[in-house]
Amino acid sequence: HMESVGRTIAGIAPWLELGPDKTAEGKLRDKYIKMVCKGLKNSVDPHADDYFNSTATRQILVNSAFLIQGLLQAPTQLWGNLDDKTQQRLIEQWKSTRTMKPGNNNWLLFSAMVECGLKSFGNEWNFEVIEKAISSHEQWYKGDGVYGDGENFHLDYYNSYVIHPMLLQVLKVVVKYDSSYQILLDKEWKRFVRYAEIQERMIAPDGSYPVLGRSVSYRSAAFQVLGASALFHQLPSSLKAGQVRGAMTAMLKRLFEQPGTFDKNGWLTIGVCGEQPELGDSYLSTPCVYLCSLGFLPLGLPADDVFWTAPLSPWTSIKAFSGEEFPIDKFMKP
C-alpha cells in the first residue's frame, strides 16, 4: 500500500500546514500531523512492519515524488516534525531512486521532483536530471496551456495529475538557486493559469465532467490545477472565487456521494463514480486511486480566505446552459 502514502500526503499537506489550533478542524489537523509523521517514521524503519523496501519496485520513485510534493507544501508541520534519523532515512530512500530510469514522458518530472527534494531537504542535487525534465517539457508544449505527455499529445488529465503541478514546483525550487529560470517559471505560471481556466469550463452543472483518457480512477485529481490555482491565489482573472468553489464542490459531491465509491471497510474503490473495476489499468491498483486527494488542495486556505468567504456564484457551464450571459473563451497566444 506504499503507493497510497505519497499521493495522500501530497493532497492533504497544504491543509496540515495550517497547523493545530483550538478549533475542531485544528484539533483534527493535530491528529493527522502526528499520524503522518509516525507513519513516515515507520515507512523508513527497517524494523517496522510498515517499512517500504526501496528496491522493491519502480513505484518507489513515483511515491517519493508525490511525497516530496507534499513535504514541500508542509515544511513546518510535516518535515519539521520528523526526527533527524527519519529525515536522513527518507533522504537515503530518495537517493536510491536514482538507479531507476524514468520514461521519456511525464516520468521525467518524478525524477526531477526527487532531486528538488534532495536539494531542499538535503542540500544536494543532480541538476542534469532537472534540466532534462524542464527542457523536455518545454519542447513538448503544444499550446493553449497544454503539454504533450512525451512528444505526442494525449487527450487525458495528466496535465493536471502530474505535468503542470510538478513542473511548476520544480521551477519554483530551481529559481531559488538560479534566477535565470525565472523566465521559464513566469511562462509556466501563465500556462498553468490558462489550464485552470479551461478546467473550470469542463465541470458541468451537475458536477460531472468529460471522462477522457487513462487513469480516470484518479477521480478529483483531474482538477488539481484548478484547486492549486485557488490555493496559490492565482485564479484566472475571468473566474471568481465563489464560482470556482461552487464548481469544485459540485464535482466532489458528484464523485464521492455515489454509492460504491467506498468499500465496506471505508477504502476507496477503483472507478470514476462508484465502483467500476473495469477502469483499472495494469499500473493502477487500489492504493493508486488515493491520488484523488489532490482534488482537495483548497483546504489549505484558512477559513477567512476569500475562497471560503466569497458568495457562491454560478460557474461557466451553469450560466451557459441556463441562457445567462457568460464570457467567451479565448486561446492563449504563444
Predicted regions and their residues:
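Structured alpha-helical bundle/scaffold domains in large eukaryotic membrane-trafficking regulators
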Residues: 20, 24, 79, 178, ...
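Alpha-helix boundary/capping detector
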Residues: 93, 225, 318-322
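Extreme N-terminal leader/anchor segments
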Residues: 1-41, 45, 323-334
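Extended hydrophobic packing segments that form well-structured cores
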Residues: 297-334
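Glycine- and acidic
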Residues: 21, 49-53, 277
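Aromatic-lined, polymer-binding surfaces characteristic
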Residues: 12-14, 29-189, 201-224
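Long, repeat-rich segments with strong aromatic
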Residues: 11, 153-270, 277-304
